[in-house]
Amino acid sequence: MSFLKSLDNNSSKFSEPFDHWELNKPLTDDQIKEIIKAEIDNPIEHNINYDGTRAIDGGQGEFREGISDGGKALKFRCFITKENEKNFPALKSLIEELQNKETHNKISKLINKDLSNSYVRVEVICDRKGFWLKPHCDIKEKLMSCLLFVNKENESEDLGTDFYNKDLKLTKTVPYRDNYGYFFSSGP
């Protein structure tokens, strides 16, 4: 129960620009290995012009193989699903840990939202050189967002996630450290 252990022993709460928690060592070594080995296209090899969204992995026809109104999207992220969970036993255990009553009760209390009937969606994303997201608010239907970094190449900590205040002023960058991350809840 690495995530819960991290939450209990290696996490810190911050209130600016909104309540969020940073976690140190939330992933197991096996989970990290599966993330690193996930089959995800390298966006650098496709000369992509990022538009500030994640739509590149299916939205724009010019990035598809085949015809622009169909074809097969390039795979720049990988959702862990019932269909592929056998390929990701360690990440499946992370999902099970997040679904565990002790874990979701603890997070529910922290973010002040009932997670007992929520759905856990885990995805492996591959943000590479040139990637950026427009400042945005998560949709209210998303009860909680969590991003856990794997940085085995010692890339700059400045490549983490930027947080903005309500005036869209940059107030913080969560550092891009190996086996480090954050979570927060959107809206009231």
Language model features by range: what are they?
Residues 3, 9-110:
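Non-heme Fe(II)/2-oxoglutarate
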Residues 5-7, 131-132:
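Short alpha-helical segments and helix-capping/turn motifs at coil-helix boundaries
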Residues 87-188:
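Catalytic core of non-heme Fe(II) oxygenases with the double-stranded beta-helix
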